[in-house]
Amino acid sequence: MKSSILHFHHITSLALRPEVAAGYKSASKKVGKMTETWLGEQVVCPACGRRLRHYEPNRPVADFLCPECRLDFELKSKKGPISTTVNDGAYSKMIERITSDTAPSFFFLQYDAEYMVRNLFVTPAHYFTPEIIEERAPLKPMAQRAGWVGCNILTKAIPASGRIYYVRDGQVRPTEEVCEQYHHTAFLSGRNLEQRGWLIDVMTCVERLRKPEFTLQEMYAFESHLAQLHPDNHNIRPKIRQQLQFLRDAGYLTFASRGCYKLTHS
């Protein structure tokens, strides 16, 4: 973990405060103000543990900035469970940002009818690839913004390792654990889009095995699945071995025995 982390701030309240949104009439704007205020007061950067700074309103694809790390964050909030797809802004702008060096990380927040935060997780920017951004149909000609193309974030495509919880089922997780989990997969940020795509796909296959130790033969069972995801690659088994080696070099896996791997965090 980065030595720059000197002191951890912990979440001390899960209550959203309606009074901070008293000047708003729109229900969505009220909720936006309440959740953004709560996040700014309670939540820290997962990379360094510092407080986040709020951007000016309506900035495309960014709501918060870490002054220390210079990382951008966007907040998506919802009453009730977070769905498998989350609406976002303009498709072209989203693709432009996630394929750039300043791609944002995303906070996904769920609150209940009493305005209490039930779940909050962050998905680091290095987990975002164009494959998990779905293009929506253009707005119809009679719409005010006719032809505008929005997008959805396919949260169902985000592996468990890319869902770093601060709050889960109303229980606050220690900030130290949040930062540790973030740094456990930070090696992805140094890879290009194609490399990240392969690594994330293989990591997702490992997660689907649902056990801390697994064999190379078990990973070969995903050969046809990975071939569908990467139709231009005709050497899937060697690619699986290569990705497992990358994950081992990054400290994500270790060798348990010949042909057998073990997750370093499970």
Task: Please provide the spans of the model-predicted regions.
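Short, cationic-aromatic polyanion-contact patches
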Residues: 258-266
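Short metal-binding segments enriched for Cys and/or His
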Residues: 71-103
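Positively charged, polyanion-binding regions of nucleic-acid-associated proteins
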Residues: 194-213
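Cysteine-rich micro-motifs
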Residues: 59-72
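A short, conserved structural fragment
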Residues: 244, 248-258
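Long, low-complexity, charged/polar intrinsically disordered regions in eukaryotic proteins
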Residues: 123-200
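Short, flexible, mixed-charge glycine/proline-rich loop motifs
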Residues: 32-42, 54-60
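Short, positively charged loop/turn segments that connect secondary-structure elements
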Residues: 224-240
